[in-house]
Amino acid sequence: MAGVRQHGWRAIPAVCSEYGADTLPDRYRSDGRCLLFRQQAGISALKQELEVKTPYRAMNHPVIGVVTKADLASMEQISLVKCWLREAGAHNVLVTSAVNNNGVTELFALLHTEEGCR
């Protein structure tokens, strides 16, 4: 497709403690601390000549917060992480567990709505 650019995703892992969030070179922790991922996801096809080049372009994208592995966390931990995600700018916060298949359908439904895709 000539003149079309596709954007992928990237993930930045971080561990939250009482001192804040620290980025990690590895993806998983075995010490039980809360692991967060900030992902910028989206596949869009834009004509290159219409693409706006600005360092603040990502600021106009919607933010969806997703709490994963909910089957391993307590309700208190889940509530705390949901609060952090809302404070970070997430308009929609979903709780998911692939083991129990909880929240996965809701996540896909949100991603396929105009509100989730804007």
Swiss-Prot record:
A single GO BP term for this record reads: biogenic amine metabolic process
Q: Name one GO molecular function term.
A: ATP binding
Q: Which InterPro entries match?
A: EutP_PduV (IPR012381), P-loop_NTPase (IPR027417)
Q: Which Gene3D superfamilies match?
A: P-loop containing nucleotide triphosphate hydrolases (3.40.50.300)
- What is the protein name given in its UniProt record? Uncharacterized protein YoeF
